[in-house]
């Protein structure tokens, strides 16, 4: 029979590389299912994810949420900041400005609904030490109801993301092929008040986004954050 010491050794309560972070085990968090097969998770990250979604729904009754992955190019000389958190800060600064600019333009025609950009990101180190970012972006669905189509000639959410990532890396936008990845079924339409006969996309979203909160493949001790929210 396991005693308390055995249990703690088998299931540590704190992250061994950052004891400020607490580990979360199990299949759910505050009533939402999570991807337990990739756990354990960082409890603080799960809390921040839920808080960010709650803030978006508190501000807007209808929210468009979607997943994006950003990668660094190989075989290309990049500035030193590309390997630090500065690059993702530059990305969101550019992306937010693009949304603000678009809302200002549509406001001139009397159509602006307003849109605060909210987000969650995680920085992970993959095979061969390759750094990449997983993102969840949340927008006012009365302002933006879809992310658009990859490769479209029209300006859409994907083209704004590509331009912002190119600018963050200091590269031409035509080199973004393969560096901006939109996962399958990336979009989630969530409502403050669940509509009758509509599936629970909020629960689906939290399950999907819980992947960003997992302990594995994050780097600590390099003075760079592995996770942040707006």
Describe each PLM feature range.
Residues 82-85, 136, 150-153:
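Short intrinsically disordered coil segments
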Residues 67, 132, 174-178:
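A structural signal for short, well-ordered beta-strand segments and their strand-loop junctions
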Residues 77-79, 104, 129-131, 142-149:
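Short, solvent-exposed secondary-structure capping/transition elements
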Residues 118-144:
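Histidine-centered divalent-metal-coordination microenvironment in nucleic-acid enzymes
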Residues 53-119, 125:
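Signature for HUH/AEP ssDNA processing cores
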Residues 2-8, 12-20, 29-60, 141-230:
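Catalytic "initiation/cleavage/transfer" segments centered on a nucleophilic residue
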């Amino acid at each position: 029979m396991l005693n308390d010491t055995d249990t703690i050794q088998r299931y540590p309560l704190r992250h061994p590389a950052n004891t400020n972070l607490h580990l979360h085990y199990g299949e759910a968090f505050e009533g939402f299912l999570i991807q337990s097969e990739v756990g354990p998770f960082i409890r603080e990250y799960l809390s921040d994810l839920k808080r960010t979604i709650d803030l978006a729904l508190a501000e807007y009754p209808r929210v468009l949420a979607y997943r994006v992955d950003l990668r660094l190019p190989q075989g290309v000389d990049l500035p030193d900041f590309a390997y630090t958190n500065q690059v993702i800060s530059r990305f969101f600064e550019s992306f937010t400005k693009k949304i603000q600019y678009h809302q200002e333009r549509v406001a001139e025609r009397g159509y602006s609904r307003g849109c605060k950009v909210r987000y969650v990101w995680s920085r992970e180190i993959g095979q061969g030490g390759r750094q990449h970012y997983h993102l969840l972006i949340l927008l006012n669905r009365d302002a933006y109801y879809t992310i658009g189509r990859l490769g479209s000639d029209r300006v859409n959410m994907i083209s704004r993301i590509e331009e912002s990532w190119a600018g963050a890396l200091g590269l031409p936008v035509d080199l973004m092929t393969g560096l901006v990845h939109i996962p399958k079924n990336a979009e989630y339409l969530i409502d403050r008040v669940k509509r009758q006969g509509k599936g629970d996309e909020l629960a689906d979203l939290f399950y999907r986004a819980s992947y960003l909160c997992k302990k594995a493949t994050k780097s600590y001790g390099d003075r760079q954050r592995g996770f942040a929210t707006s």
